[in-house]
Amino acid sequence: MSVRPVVITIDGPSGSGKGTVAGLLAKRLGWNLLDSGALYRLLAFAARNHGVDLTNEEALKVLAAHLDVQFVTSTDLHPQQIILEGEDVTDAIRNEQVGAGASQVASLPAVREALLQRQHAFLEPPGLVADGRDMGTVVFPDAPLKVFLTARAEERARRRYQQLKESGVDANLSSLLGEISKRDERDSQRAVAPLKAAPDAIQLDSTELTIEQVVERIMSEIAARDLAG
């Protein structure tokens, strides 16, 4: 009888650092990585490329079921590359327009259902680190370790501003804060899989912590629960 691989979930709002933390954890553990938020960004990005309206639930469902996507673990500073239809779109899907589109398509029940099975397929040996907004509540509710990572909205906006500036993209801090606040409200109030911590999740506020400090805290939990084998 085969033993089911372990999955660790990391949920949280936009800009909390969950994607970077998940990528570094997966690299440290030698496990698979699922960036579920990227799946919704990829869908919004692909929809625009293929001329699919973001309100056309049926067409988006079909597109979601056939997304040709790969997550490739790379360097410490950039824990993963995201490949869509053979093209590296890691940076292309990280702008605010694609993020808004991702939040829009994520509110559609048929889209979430189409992507649910795709997310389950990432759970393969030796283990999986899955980050998103409903990993611990909907996608992997039986995960033995669930983390809900957050930070104050002002700090999340500052991080995003710094990230954009380092990438050579013009950004406005107050506009970013407004966009993050709107997205928080939209994600937490949507009818399907709203953003919330699982009852048994460990809640970490990363406002005053470095990425490495967050990773070490989670690694301590993994060791305490003997999840890494």
UniProtKB/Swiss-Prot annotation:
Subcellular location per UniProt equals: Cytoplasm
Q: Which InterPro entries match?
A: Cytidylate_kin, Cytidylate_kinase_dom, P-loop_NTPase
Residues reported to bind ATP = G12, P13, S14, G15, S16, G17, K18, G19, T20
Q: Which reaction does it catalyse?
A: CMP + ATP = CDP + ADP; dCMP + ATP = dCDP + ADP
EC no.? 2.7.4.25
Q: Which Gene3D superfamilies match?
A: P-loop containing nucleotide triphosphate hydrolases (3.40.50.300)
| SUPFAM superfamilies, sorted | P-loop containing nucleoside triphosphate hydrolases
Specify the enzyme's EC class, one word.
transferase
HAMAP family named among the record's database cross-references: Cytidyl_kinase_type1
Q: Which family does it belong to?
A: Belongs to the cytidylate kinase family. Type 1 subfamily.
Q: What is this protein called?
A: Cytidylate kinase
Gene name linked to the record:
cmk
